[in-house]
């Protein structure tokens, strides 16, 4: 089975969707290459699975440089930043996924690095210590985050480019599915089936690729009806999954609003997962209302459960 990496486009011309973002990136990349400069520091924010890592790798490929990848929660102290940057060469890309999770010491070290491409470090102890300035090759920092509000203002101001990646249009998701099926599987899928997969992907390319792989698995085993396949893997109308349905049923059983803490206890899920993975899509489809008193299912949410016979 193909990995997520193999589904990723390697160059901007192969990236499907987000036309305005692509057109702007093409301008910025062309200018950087002609001026022989490193690409400006870039912040990508948006939902998981919308192409932030893919775009970081594309920028590195377009600039013909290496991409060094790490996670924000691994960078807590100045020494973590020093160790990371000790590996880079001139104009390389450093990609920090979930950059909001960096520690305070790492953030403070990044501030001077991003502007001056140097780090001031203490060598020695006590009265014998002295400050030494360590020069860093010019590089491009690309940060990705699903929580834009947690990015410190001082860090945000140091990015030359800030791009928001939201959900993709259904036609864009359909094009992604069509291309990946042709390139990797060549399974018989008609236009209606491709659109059905796309309409259940919540506008997220990563989810679309996951659904495509599951459809391929079942079709290879003789299951040809897409709707039946989705029932077997518990994917419901609009792409809602079992967690979404369980959440809606918790609210359906309440006469009044219910708080996030209580929902988390009933579902045995952490509050962060509920707030970031479940609720945004349900709010978008007007299935729930959220206010200071808590959460409440809407008429649309109740109709969805009843029409799909999903009341538990």
UniProtKB/Swiss-Prot annotation:
Domain of life: Bacteria
Region (Head domain (RuvB-H)): 237-312
GO biological process, alphabetically ordered: DNA recombination; DNA repair
Region Small ATPAse domain (RuvB-S): start-end pairs: 169-234
Alphabetical list of CDD domains matching this protein: AAA
InterPro entries: AAA+_ATPase, AAA_lid_4, DNA_helicase_Holl-junc_RuvB, P-loop_NTPase, RuvB-like_N, RuvB_C, WH-like_DNA-bd_sf, WH_DNA-bd_sf
Residues reported to bind Mg(2+): 53
Catalysed conversion reaction: ATP + H2O = ADP + phosphate + H(+)
A Pfam cross-reference name: RuvB_C
UniProt entry tagged with the keyword Hydrolase: yes
Binding site for DNA: 290, 295
Database matches in Gene3D superfamilies: 1.10.8.60, P-loop containing nucleotide triphosphate hydrolases (3.40.50.300), Winged helix-like DNA-binding domain superfamily/Winged helix DNA-binding domain (1.10.10.10)
Location in or out of the cell: Cytoplasm
Residues annotated for ATP binding in this entry: 8, 49, 52-54, 115-117, 158, 168, 206
SUPFAM superfamilies in alphabetical order: P-loop containing nucleoside triphosphate hydrolases, Winged helix' DNA-binding domain
Entry keyword set: ATP-binding, Cytoplasm, DNA damage, DNA recombination, DNA repair, DNA-binding, Hydrolase, Nucleotide-binding
EC number(s) given by UniProt: 3.6.4.-
Large ATPase domain (RuvB-L), as annotated region: 1-168
GO cellular component term of the entry, any: cytoplasm
Family recorded in the similarity comment: Belongs to the RuvB family.
Function: The RuvA-RuvB-RuvC complex processes Holliday junction (HJ) DNA during genetic recombination and DNA repair, while the RuvA-RuvB complex plays an important role in the rescue of blocked DNA replication forks via replication fork reversal (RFR). RuvA specifically binds to HJ cruciform DNA, conferring on it an open structure. The RuvB hexamer acts as an ATP-dependent pump, pulling dsDNA into and through the RuvAB complex. RuvB forms 2 homohexamers on either side of HJ DNA bound by 1 or 2 RuvA tetramers; 4 subunits per hexamer contact DNA at a time.
Subunit-structure text: Homohexamer. Forms an RuvA(8)-RuvB(12)-Holliday junction (HJ) complex. HJ DNA is sandwiched between 2 RuvA tetramers; dsDNA enters through RuvA and exits via RuvB. An RuvB hexamer assembles on each DNA strand where it exits the tetramer. Each RuvB hexamer is contacted by two RuvA subunits (via domain III) on 2 adjacent RuvB subunits; this complex drives branch migration. In the full resolvosome a probable DNA-RuvA(4)-RuvB(12)-RuvC(2) complex forms which resolves the HJ.
Domain notes: Has 3 domains, the large (RuvB-L) and small ATPase (RuvB-S) domains and the C-terminal head (RuvB-H) domain. The head domain binds DNA, while the ATPase domains jointly bind ATP, ADP or are empty depending on the state of the subunit in the translocation cycle. During a single DNA translocation step the structure of each domain remains the same, but their relative positions change.
Name of the protein described by the UniProt record: Holliday junction branch migration complex subunit RuvB
Organism of derivation: Ureaplasma parvum serovar 3 (strain ATCC 700970)
Gene field: ruvB
